[in-house]
Amino acid sequence: MDNNNNMSRINGHNVGHFEIPAENVESLKDFYSSLFDWQFEKGQTQGYWMIKNAGISGGLMQKENPEQISTIFIEVESIEDYTGKAKELGSKVVKDKQEISEGYYAVLQDPQGNTFGIWENK
């Protein structure tokens, strides 16, 4: 897989971030550092580590519950507009719009149960 970021952006709704939940954050940091040479930087949220060199924005964090899975985040212009559109198309809201230092996010579930996030920059 070529990671030179030569792929064109079609419509601006790109995968812009991913998160990997961990039962043991330090252990997974060691794993991904050894496997992919990823470098980590402490995030602004406690227990959150930004992945610095994974091609796109990524994070490693402490699991909030045993069922928590990896999540991709798609960039959108407006959380409210896309949450509404997703609900009209049969999506469920897992987590309403949240604000963090860099922007806003919400977590949704598609009609077949797949969880994904949407992201709006500040």
Which functions belong to the PLM regions below?
Residues V93, Q98-Q109:
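C-terminal structural segments of small proteins and small subunits
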Residues F31-Y32, A86, G113:
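Conserved active-site tyrosine of GNAT-family acetyltransferases
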Residues N14-E23, E64-L89, Y105-Q109:
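Vicinal oxygen chelate
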